[in-house]
Amino acid sequence: MLSLSAKNHFTVSNSITHVIKSYHIRTLTSSAEKMPHITTPFSTSASSTKLKAFRKVRPVLQRHSSSWIVAQNHRRSLSGQSSLNDLRHLNRFPHHTLKTSNNEFYPAEQLTLEDVNENVLKAKYAVRGAIPMRAEELKAQLEKDPQSLPFDRIINANIGNPQQLQQKPLTYYRQVLSLLQYPELLNQNEQQLVDSKLFKLDAIKRAKSLMEDIGGSVGAYSSSQGVEGIRKSVAEFITKRDEGEISYPEDIFLTAGASAAVNYLLSIFCRGPETGVLIPIPQYPLYTATLALNNSQALPYYLDENSGWSTNPEEIETVVKEAIQNEIKPTVLVVINPGNPTGAVLSPESIAQIFEVAAKYGTVVIADEVYQENIFPGTKFHSMKKILRHLQREHPGKFDNVQLASLHSTSKGVSGECGQRGGYMELTGFSHEMRQVILKLASISLCPVVTGQALVDLMVRPPVEGEESFESDQAERNSIHEKLITRAMTLYETFNSLEGIECQKPQGAMYLFPKIDLPFKAVQEARHLELTPDEFYCKKLLESTGICTVPGSGFGQEPGTYHLRTTFLAPGLEWIKKWESFHKEFFDQYRD
Amino acid sequence: MLSLSAKNHFTVSNSITHVIKSYHIRTLTSSAEKMPHITTPFSTSASSTKLKAFRKVRPVLQRHSSSWIVAQNHRRSLSGQSSLNDLRHLNRFPHHTLKTSNNEFYPAEQLTLEDVNENVLKAKYAVRGAIPMRAEELKAQLEKDPQSLPFDRIINANIGNPQQLQQKPLTYYRQVLSLLQYPELLNQNEQQLVDSKLFKLDAIKRAKSLMEDIGGSVGAYSSSQGVEGIRKSVAEFITKRDEGEISYPEDIFLTAGASAAVNYLLSIFCRGPETGVLIPIPQYPLYTATLALNNSQALPYYLDENSGWSTNPEEIETVVKEAIQNEIKPTVLVVINPGNPTGAVLSPESIAQIFEVAAKYGTVVIADEVYQENIFPGTKFHSMKKILRHLQREHPGKFDNVQLASLHSTSKGVSGECGQRGGYMELTGFSHEMRQVILKLASISLCPVVTGQALVDLMVRPPVEGEESFESDQAERNSIHEKLITRAMTLYETFNSLEGIECQKPQGAMYLFPKIDLPFKAVQEARHLELTPDEFYCKKLLESTGICTVPGSGFGQEPGTYHLRTTFLAPGLEWIKKWESFHKEFFDQYRD
């Protein structure tokens, strides 16, 4: 027990060799709101020349709190006062009473990583992990000294961020959004706007009708579920896409990108370590990160690389059964289709098999379908909702209880509007009660950004034939699509032509996930540098060519195999040639 | 134990009176991707006329999953098959093995509210609660039949959503955002754009410079911490606002509104029931909702109504000590200044006293300062950051460890851009390590909406004297400000002139939180209707006048007292007169 009163001296432990000088205390008196001489419960006794000099230095030290404290301690020892560090812990959450008088106190310690929610510490998100962070450092270095590296720019192939790589936004979208932001333009004479050649008539009309749906301003909160008129557009889009299988606006939630939808769904179903969520390996690490935050279990099911990263339903069922045996409830099953990072697109049969397992075990399915507009020739996308409805028709009673949440986003496709945060989820088989719970969660974040909601409307209702923007819009889409295909195929063929790297043929999405078969010497050097072999390859690739990718470990892979994920969004084919040269040199250097 | 094989019949319990007919199973074979005749592991045996007729009815029933199942069961009993309901639970998480052959299975039950994360079920957010939901119903009713109610429109005084109530956005902001959305406009000849009288020159220039900061497109993901150039603007704004106390861009995080910042901060520090977060009562219910989601404890500290809802530091310290005694760690202290719902603005002394407690106990302070631009004449806003720096200067060593997160938003002030989701937090006293943890959390959501980030830049760097938009921008701001003041004062004076309702004088924010002293008869009727008295008053108010408010219980209040929160955003003064009439009639009806 310690007691302190004004002017007492005491020794707490041997490590404190200085005597603590007490502070004079003045009671707080009310005062005018004049700054900066406020009276507070205490004042310092020191006003030495050293302190005055020190105060000038302080702003620089304030940058890092720990430096600041070190500097303060230094100052205190300069002035003969003892370090308070050793005492601080006493005041933190004292189990004993520090009897204070006149409001003197010892400042408690800061909160540190030790105080942070462990779930947050555990969560990892590699897409913006170590290699991309290194790329940022190199980018900054190039800005200072453009000649200092063997390349002149960083190519961010680590993230599906098309417009960062000079992909142009679709003109129609941006005309509409521009008009929504500045409705004064809509008060102008339509013909004058059209004659200015800045806005097309159909864009003007769409902006006006959207403005009505929205209620008059993109600056007002909308309903938390999203603007009703836009949800109707989404439902119509889904119905048409799914060959007439009806979708209802009540089942649609507009969200700030698909990531927000994942967040809601996992918040709702994750109850802690006894909850299991099946995720494909390799996966998009949003899922494992969110599971870590929710302190729930990831149940990985491996995709089969050799058959184009296909999904194996027996694998899924095995994982489910094992979870049950381990008393973990396999509550949710995540399917990413088209796959990220794999680029695989599921056949109707695969989807049906997945639903069998879901129906049998009562597992909610999350269908992450954000890449459904990124499909390569020769492949057809079938939505999981459509297949579910077919199964329900064909096999009455078997699939009626299946609960499915299907996600889409304006970040991908050919629009690539990642920074606008538009998306939606469609809930199938969720009761009104369950939807109300999700609505409540959504209401705590108030509403998704309204311009993002508008963008969803544009995505699901693009210009149609006969409308003024149709032809140019089609031309823009085709151009982007063709370039993506060309780059994807070039990269794919390049990988397969080189030794030590092979790749499954992409069917969709924006990524390749090649397997790297590193020579033993390279693996040794990686270990020496305390990197995994895939990190090592990615690091070398970055430092030689400026191409930033993400090691396969960020997505999960069969133990003993090494991959990396790259996008094929960067314009041109030059960077692919650079990669090819680098790879050959790398293997020349490390070949056994 | 049950075993099933093809064509077996069995009875499970007395309640199953029908015999289960087995299904023929066909092994899945690969097939062309032709729809809809996919082969699946099993097929139904039924294809009766009744079923075909039923299928036409099905789309309507699909709307509600439970109706769908009922319909299916009905169909099955029509065709002589027994209900599968009673068997479903067996397959859910079977502890025994259901030996199946040929992939037949019984569908498991759906997940229901019983399976939902309890924390989500517990969370409440009253701002969009029962009374506002009733208002939405009445709104829909008015759309169908405008004469059916004693009022012609709903006035949403329940939410701080200015642009929903015809407050116009600031022209300068919207010109810049419009240009950012459609950069083609920036490629035009500047003079021509100006001559069109649609865009002012300073808006064009700002859009160009922001576009450079952003990196070329609002459609690309930005860095997760937010565009660097915009963070610099924020740091400069804070430094200037705080009389030269330096703010650093590294300490700034741009966020999707202040709500996202609260979400990050509480995720990081909430570790479960042993974590306590002090919140003011009354509070903005985002805090209690988020605490419920994080399964941590709210530690309420009561604001003092009779002294204008001031903060009592002794009350705060008492709450802290009690928490410690109950083995709850008082980790975070939330201060809402200006207050929501109270409208109170803290004096420098009050702030200093709050920091004393924080410094003494090592509690992180969240300063929710989103209403700092909504200050009434005669009141001055002092940021908590500024006061902290003063305390650190005046009392070296005492306050060095204090950790503070200060929040701001583009949703309030005179811009009222709620739907655009712009905001920031400034971290003071957080080490680099701690900032990295927050950065990681932010990266899981990728980035805040980029146009919202741009709006933050506009908020902290409005047009200045000499620039083309300055005068009109000032005029717009003053006009909005004056109208807000007029309505606030009118409402305040009206409340205080009536019996049974009294109100503290607002110093800032967008709300009044009057206390209602209901007559006993009214309290009785409320209880009869199973409503709290404040809900009852709000419901009556809504149904008589269309004015939608939020009962005080949504924000917290001293037990035995009743309040409601209303905004003063609705245009004009007519609705205030309506309220006055309603209140007099209400008291005439219920007076003892």
UniProtKB/Swiss-Prot annotation, chains A, B:
Residues 1-64 form a transit peptide. SUPFAM superfamilies: PLP-dependent transferases (SSF53383). Pfam families: Aminotran_1_2. GO terms for cellular component: mitochondrial matrix; mitochondrion. Pathway: Amino-acid degradation; L-alanine degradation via transaminase pathway; pyruvate from L-alanine: step 1/1. The modification Phosphoserine is found at residue 77. InterPro entries: ALAT1/2-like, Aminotransferase_I/II_large, PyrdxlP-dep_Trfase, PyrdxlP-dep_Trfase_major, PyrdxlP-dep_Trfase_small. It catalyses: L-alanine + 2-oxoglutarate = pyruvate + L-glutamate. GO terms for molecular function: L-alanine:2-oxoglutarate aminotransferase activity; pyridoxal phosphate binding. Pyridoxal 5'-phosphate binds at residues 258-259, 284, 340, 409, 421. Its EC number is 2.6.1.2. Its cofactor is pyridoxal 5'-phosphate. Induction: Induced by alanine. It is found in: Mitochondrion matrix. Its main location: mitochondrion. One of its GO terms (biological process) is L-alanine catabolic process. Keywords: Aminotransferase, Mitochondrion, Phosphoprotein, Pyridoxal phosphate, Transferase, Transit peptide. Belongs to the class-I pyridoxal-phosphate-dependent aminotransferase family. Alanine aminotransferase subfamily. Present with 9960 molecules/cell in log phase SD medium. Homodimer. This is Alanine aminotransferase, mitochondrial. It comes from Saccharomyces cerevisiae (strain ATCC 204508 / S288c) (Baker's yeast). The gene is ALT1.
